[in-house]
Amino acid sequence: VPHEGEEFGFVLDGKITLTLGKKKYVCRRGESFYYSADRTHKISNESNAKARFIWISSPPNF
């Protein structure tokens, strides 16, 4: 759900899929991501392996 703010993340292990609007990006261990939260976004793990990441939201809405 779009909302005010910005979001940043860093993948610690595995890989995640970041969906921004209609585009999908795969982020792997050691990679980071950033986006303006005012558009549709989703973070998911589309594999059977575990994934861990740090997620920072500003302002802290959740």
Model features per residue range: what roles?
Residues 3-18:
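Short, conserved beta-strand element in jelly-roll/cupin
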Residues 21-36:
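Short acidic-glycine-tyrosine-enriched beta hairpin
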Residues 4, 19, 28-29, 49:
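Generic detection of intrinsically disordered/low-complexity segments and helix-coil linkers/edges
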Residues 1-5, 56-59:
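Short beta-strand/loop turn elements enriched in aromatics
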Residues 28, 37-62:
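Ligand-binding loop in jelly-roll beta-barrel domains
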Residues 10, 34, 55:
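Conserved beta-strand segments that form the floor/walls of ligand-binding pockets within enzyme
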Residues 14-19, 32-33, 41:
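Short beta-strand segments in beta-sandwich/barrel cores
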Residues 1, 8, 24-25, 45:
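Short secondary-structure boundary/capping segments
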